[in-house]
A protein has these predicted regions:
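Charge-rich, well-structured scaffold segments of protease-associated domains
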Residues: 1-75, 101-104, 110-114, 132, ...
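Short, surface-exposed beta-strand/loop micro-motifs that present aromatic residues
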Residues: 29-33, 86-95
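A broadly conserved detector of short glycine/acidic/proline-rich loop/turn motifs that flank catalytic sites
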Residues: 46, 92-94, 109-112, 127
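Active/ligand-binding-proximal structured segments within catalytic/core domains
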Residues: 115-128
Length: 269
């Protein structure tokens, strides 16, 4: 609903109604069209004793392929110019409890947000998602069974801030929406206390540091680097995301959180 006609507007797993009628040839044709070295990023982790020999192996693996250009433009994408609401039903097993079983996504499209604004929004979503935030506290008051998280989506034609709530009913959407508006304005006006800011920043910094202790560090790093490259076109995007963690206090001191919150996350947007 947020990005009609774009790649992001389609289910990543495919259109369920089309899958049963797909032929094996169609699957192979799709694989041939998109599973290609020119549409990939090769990442290497660990010590390489003989770089020349390693590069020779890569050359041997990739040499059978001709370089190929890929077009990821979205000519059918039509930007939304007013609020859009879409309700989707999903099947459940007979006897499944459906009370408070709705999942709600509220998306704010941040049209033309600069790289710096996206960096600020990324940290802002982490602050809003924290259990000590005004948003979480206010939501408990009006929808005690609901849980909420917030994240910055960069896969679409425009960056977007997405609020995801579970443990609610379809009829609670307006209550959720009003809670988000009020909480964002409260945050914009009051910011967050230094103690909470320090605690959240320290927790995320520790979480990032502990990644180096994981046994599958190389695999996880490669996946993160590749994902950030695919969504931004910048092979250093993941590094920049990690470095941005140092800016929690800086953005608050400079009033950046309030600035982007009022610009992109209010009822008028």
């Amino acid at each position: 609903a947020a990005f009609p006609g774009s790649h992001m507007g389609y289910n990543q797993g495919g259109e369920p109604t089309e899958i049963p009628s797909m032929t094996w040839q169609e699957v192979k044709d799709y694989h041939t069209a998109y599973y290609h070295p020119s549409n990939s990023l090769t990442t290497v982790y660990g010590a390489i004793d003989d770089p020349a020999a390693f590069l020779a192996l890569l050359d041997e693996a990739f040499s059978p392929y001709e370089a190929k250009a890929f077009d990821f433009s979205t000519p059918d994408y039509t930007p939304v110019t007013s609020p859009v609401e879409k309700v989707c039903q999903y099947p459940v097993y007979e006897g499944t409890e459906t009370e408070n079983a709705a999942v709600t996504y509220i998306t704010f499209i941040c049209e033309n947000a600069t790289e710096e604004e996206q960096n600020v929004l990324d940290l802002l979503t982490m602050l809003l998602s924290d259990s000590s935030s005004a948003l979480v506290s206010n939501l408990v008051d009006v929808l005690p069974n609901a849980d909420i998280s917030v994240y910055l989506e960069t896969d679409g034609p425009e960056p977007a801030v997405v609020f995801v709530a579970t443990g609610m009913n379809e009829g609670d959407v307006q209550t959720l929406r009003e809670c988000i508006y009020a909480s964002v304005l409260e945050f914009a006006e009051n910011g967050v206390s230094q103690d909470i800011l320090d605690a959240i920043a320290s927790s995320l910094t520790m979480e990032t540091a502990l990644m180096s202790e994981e046994s599958d560090l190389g695999v996880n790093m490669a996946q993160n680097i590749a994902y950030c490259w695919a969504t931004t076109g910048d092979v250093h995007a993941y590094e920049k995301t990690i470095a941005n963690m140092d800016n929690f206090e800086k953005y608050q001191t400079e009033g950046k959180y309030a600035e982007v919150a009022k610009k992109y996350l209010t009822e008028d947007n």
